[in-house]
């Protein structure tokens, strides 16, 4: 604002000099004297009542130029402004001297301002002489006469029948006048004049010069930029709200069981909805016009207005809550990676919610909007105390821990990559990587949203410069400044736009990072509440879903069908159709045949001798022996059990489908037997042990 003050002083003195130069016509026979207007801003500053008006000038024209300058003199210290006002008045409203003797025709002459009053201004305004100096020249000369004479001005009136040295005494102001006179209620359009008490008591006025405030609303971006921002926010906040409700229902309503992670995701969904509510409040049009404006001309909404409190409260919960719960999510992920749990999760959650609500209610009398804001938030009064105490400090502490846990988790995942190199199923690793990417993305959004207000605050000169140029133009172009002065345009719209986007996509980022997972489908399939809701509209969900096979069951249908097709190469078409129809039954038959084969093999083990043991019987015995040995040696013979069970299944299928394929079965058994030897070298030992038992 100091820079603006200097610019206005320059403008003030420039117009003062312009007024003086235009009013100095040494002899103007058509000039006239008039009684000073009672509404003139200089009425109390003069010790005379009749003023000199050169040809073409009126009191109204002089008053129109003097009034804004009088107003701007209020920016100076009291002693300086009072003397500067006096000098302005005696230079613009010169004392009129009538009844000059011996001249014809009769005409009045002006009294120039005395030099001592100019010197007084230089003395009391010495701190501003670096700016005022070129314009307050007390030794200036115009048309051969001193502009600020020490005693008076000599006029040569011989051409009019008068004296060659007619002296007219210099004039001075009313020294009894001071700066406590009634203020001039004038501001150039579109600025609005507001008394000081109202500005101080109600706040939220954008004061440019003393008592002159910007109108509400004042556009600080182009129409295209406003539309781009509005439509982007409307679309993204709508999607973000839908995504947030999806997260709340998926992780907070439908699950049959709840984890700490579920609750944190629900918390994040709630805070994202709070941000959307604050946006909805600020974009509402109550009776038309801009939401930020009140019925008081020039005043933006503050804590005196209920809607401002509502919007600021939800924005504080949404912004601060998102940051705190993201740090809690990163902490929970850190514990999970280290095989630990948060035993005090309930207490932590309650404490965080209490802290968020506390920080939203504490500054309830300090929410306000402004020319640069989209809605209501914490004011920057008291050296930004409320912003730092209620938002920046807790959010930056939470962001610090969020960063620590993210870095620690990245290191943990890096170590996990070594462990998962030899494992085909890397889903756990991929899920952890996705969670980290989500946290990094959401951390960027949060960090940008919290840093942008600080950027605006600490670069305020760049933004106020646009206002200064605009206001200076208004004063320099009275009364047409509003028509000729360009609109205020704040710099860095791209940053402002990015700030709006990062807040609007919180729910969308949450959906991508947390709500798209194969596990989600399982939640809905198993959800009792979801099935109940579907049942209300006549939809059955999950009743015919496949059940998991028990351990020891046969292979899937695709394996069974493959064996059947291989053994039916010689069958006719009817047999193939019959088998396809009975494919579901063959699975059960395999299990029965497998049991029968095992029983038959046990009989062979108990009754046979080495002399009557053939290769097929030996293979069956080996299969059964392997199954028995697997009960005692799970670690060594699991693969043999699976292979031998498959052999039995293949044999059973072959027996069911074609009784004439014994040779093929033997070949298959031999091949499978060879595979068993390749998978487990203990088969030979099993054969020897079987022969020994038979002996």
Swiss-Prot record:
It is found in: Membrane. Glycans are attached at residues 47, 137, 178. Residues 255-262, 329-343, 409-435, 522-695 are cytoplasmic. Disulfide bonds join 33-96, 42-89, 80-125, 114-170, 118-138. The keyword Glycoprotein applies. It comes from the Eukaryota. Residues 24-233, 284-307, 365-387, 457-500 are extracellular. The keyword Glycoprotein applies. It is a multi-pass membrane protein. The chain crosses the membrane at residues 234-254, 263-283, 308-328, 344-364, 388-408, 436-456, 501-521. Residues 545-556, 609-625 have a biased composition (Polar residues). Residues 653-691 form a coiled coil. CDD domains: CRD_FZ. Belongs to the G-protein coupled receptor Fz/Smo family. Keywords: Coiled coil, Disulfide bond, Glycoprotein, Membrane, Receptor, Signal, Transmembrane, Transmembrane helix. Residues 28-173 form the FZ domain. This is Frizzled and smoothened-like protein O. Residues 593-608, 626-686 have a biased composition (Low complexity). Residues 1-23 form the signal peptide. Its main location: membrane. Residues 545-695 are annotated as: Disordered. GO terms for cellular component: membrane.
């Amino acid at each position: 604002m100091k820079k603006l003050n200097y610019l206005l002083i320059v403008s003030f003195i420039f117009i003062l000099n312009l007024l003086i130069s235009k009013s100095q016509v040494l002899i103007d026979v058509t000039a006239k004297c008039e009684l000073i207007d009672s509404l003139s801003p200089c009425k109390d500053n003069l010790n005379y009542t009749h003023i000199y008006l050169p040809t073409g000038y009126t009191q109204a024209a002089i008053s129109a130029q003097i009034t804004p300058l009088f107003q701007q003199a209020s920016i100076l210290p009291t002693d300086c402004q009072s003397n500067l006002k006096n000098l302005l008045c005696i230079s613009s409203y010169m004392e009129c001297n009538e009844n000059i003797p011996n001249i014809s025709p009769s005409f009045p002459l002006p009294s120039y301002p005395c030099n001592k009053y100019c010197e007084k201004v230089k003395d009391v305004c010495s701190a501003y002489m670096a700016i005022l100096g070129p314009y307050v020249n007390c030794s200036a000369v115009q048309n051969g006469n001193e502009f600020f004479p020490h005693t008076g001005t000599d006029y040569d009136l011989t051409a009019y029948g008068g004296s060659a040295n007619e002296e007219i005494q210099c004039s001075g102001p009313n020294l009894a006048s001071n700066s406590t006179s009634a203020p001039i209620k004038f501001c150039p359009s579109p600025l609005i004049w507001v008394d000081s008490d109202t500005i101080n008591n109600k706040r939220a006025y954008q004061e440019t010069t003393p008592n002159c405030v910007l109108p509400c609303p004042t556009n600080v971006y182009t129409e295209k930029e406003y539309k781009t921002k509005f439509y982007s926010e409307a679309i993204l906040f709508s999607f973000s709200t839908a995504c947030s409700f999806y997260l709340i229902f998926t992780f907070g309503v439908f699950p049959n069981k709840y984890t700490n992670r579920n609750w944190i995701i629900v918390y994040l969904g709630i805070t994202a909805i709070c941000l959307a509510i604050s946006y909805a409040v600020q974009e509402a049009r109550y009776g038309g016009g801009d939401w930020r404006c009140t019925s008081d001309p020039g005043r933006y909404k503050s804590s005196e207005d209920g809607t401002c409190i509502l919007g600021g409260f939800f924005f504080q919960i949404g912004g601060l809550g998102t940051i705190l719960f993201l740090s809690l999510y990163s902490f929970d992920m850190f514990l999970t990676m280290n095989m630990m749990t948060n035993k005090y999760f309930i207490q932590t959650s309650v404490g965080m919610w209490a802290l968020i609500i506390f920080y939203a209610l504490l500054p309830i009398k300090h929410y306000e909007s402004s020319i640069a804001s989209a809605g209501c938030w914490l004011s920057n009064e008291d050296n930004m105390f409320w912003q730092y105490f209620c938002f920046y400090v807790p959010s930056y502490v939470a962001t610090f821990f969020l960063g620590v846990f993210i870095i620690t988790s990245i290191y943990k995942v890096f170590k996990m990559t070594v462990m998962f190199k030899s494992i085909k199923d890397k889903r756990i690793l991929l899920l952890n990587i996705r969670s980290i990417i989500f946290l990094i993305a959401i951390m960027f959004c949060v960090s940008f949203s919290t840093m942008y207000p600080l950027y605006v605050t600490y670069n305020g000169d760049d933004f106020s410069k646009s206002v200064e140029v605009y206001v200076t133009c208004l004063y320099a172009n009275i009364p047409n400044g509003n028509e000729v002065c360009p609109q205020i345009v704040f710099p860095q719209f791209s940053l402002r736009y990015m700030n709006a986007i990062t807040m609007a996509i919180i729910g969308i980022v949450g959906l991508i990072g947390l709500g798209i997972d194969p596990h989600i489908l399982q939640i809905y399939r198993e959800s009792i509440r979801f099935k109940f809701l579907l049942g209300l509209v006549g939809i059955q969900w999950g009743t015919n879903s496949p059940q998991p096979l028990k351990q020891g069951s046969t292979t899937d249908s695709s394996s069974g069908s493959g064996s059947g097709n291989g053994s039916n190469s010689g069958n006719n078409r009817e047999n193939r159709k019959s088998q396809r129809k009975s494919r579901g039954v063959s699975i059960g038959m395999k299990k029965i045949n497998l049991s029968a084969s095992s029983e038959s093999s046990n009989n062979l083990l108990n009754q046979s001798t080495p002399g009557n043991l053939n290769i097929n019987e030996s293979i069956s015995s080996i299969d059964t022996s392997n199954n028995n040995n697997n009960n005692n040696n799970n670690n060594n013979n699991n693969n043999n059990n699976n292979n031998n069970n498959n052999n039995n299944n293949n044999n059973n299928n072959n027996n069911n489908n074609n009784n004439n394929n014994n040779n093929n079965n033997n070949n298959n058994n031999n091949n499978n037997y060879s595979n068993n030897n390749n998978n487990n070298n203990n088969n030979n030992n099993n054969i020897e042990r079987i022969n020994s038992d038979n002996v």
